[in-house]
Amino acid sequence: MLDSMPPEDHGFHDGRSPLADRSPEAAAPGAPTHPRPRRWIVWLTTAAVAIGAWALVGYPIYEFPAPAPFRGTRFFNPYEPDGGRWLKANFHAHASAWLGIADGRASESDVARTYAAMGYDIVGLSNYWRISRTHSVPRVYAAYEHGANLGRSHHLVIGAHSVLAFDFPLVQNIHQKQFLLRLLHDASEVLLIAHPRLRGGFSSYDVARLTNYDGMEAVSGIRKSQEWWDAALSAGRLRWNVSGDDSHDSSDPTATGVCWTMIRAASIAESDVLAAISQGLTYGVEGKGGRLGIALDECLMHDGTLRVRTVPAASTITFIGQGGVARQTVAGVSQADYVFRDDDTYIRVEIEGEGNHLYLNPVVRTDGGRPDTAEARVNWPLSIGMWLSYTIAGVGIIAAAARWSRRRASGRMARSRTPQ
């Protein structure tokens, strides 16, 4: 009777365990395999979240000093006391770099020779993320242009100690801009906002609140941003104008020798020149071929009256105040006086004549000495809260991607077991 019963099927065939059938390596040729979860999806998601975190939250939240126009019964005039000599400088010129992918068309030597031929004393070869010091005539100072982001928020770093390769790649908010300004300012002697108006790189709101920068290219070869300069000054931010060509082709006369800065320094030594820029002993010039047909002779304050004298006589001398409003214009003179009104918080001067347009730095009200602006401060509770929120969100996204990948893998395995 026992011999007539069919043998029990324990799942053992040809001496193999049924677990062996689940191994893709043991499957018969041509049989469907059971794919593993696609881990690359998880890794790709993790990388995307990391890049997004860097671009979105790799910075603190700041509290900015409230705009407060200059005030006081005294005046700070950057052009006093007198002394030193005037030097011609351009800190924004690009030479060939990075295998020709970016920057200028000419070599560093050619760029230096071009400016030397136009009588420049100082040149800054401000290539992107590259400091050049290759020539003594004209003096080449350590400078570079920082910025590789969709919003075109760029900086001109002069007297650079090192290159900051970090940047936020997307359109930057004001907190990201402040974070970069603080990093760049700590690694340089003079920090400028480059062409602030170009493609919305910086708004007038930004420059009126940001701290840790010395000035801006209110007038450059590619963009004029006087309204931005006046916005900062009207908010009580003492910022100097440093004009430059921003030339990418030194052989182009329409782009080279069209905007530069005159600096009154004790000597051509780099320390003296950078100190003069920081003090505001400069004025910007527009012209052609680097030719200076009219120059500032003096800018003095006495008993509430600002006196400007030029050599030779100017076509016009215009005094501009709070909000960028022209307060007074005088024509065909070599000397003009302006009496500060009670509501004048600052006055800056523009001079036209002999094929040039000059932009003087402002004289501002103060209670004594140079007015200082408080620095933006980190709001730690908001910053930590933001970081935690985005960390939780990022972990959730990565976990969801991992679960999705596992479900897809399980589905493929189940389908592979289904008899065809």
For the regions a protein language model found, what residue spans apply to each?
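C-terminal functional module detector
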Residues: 2-82, 98, 249-420
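A metal-dependent hydrolase metal-coordination microenvironment
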Residues: 30, 54-205, 209-211, 218-231, ...
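Short glycine/proline-enriched coil/turn segments at helix->beta-strand junctions
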Residues: 135-139, 186-188, 237, 313-315, ...
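Catalytic-core segments of hydrolase enzymes
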Residues: 216-217, 240-242, 257-259, 266
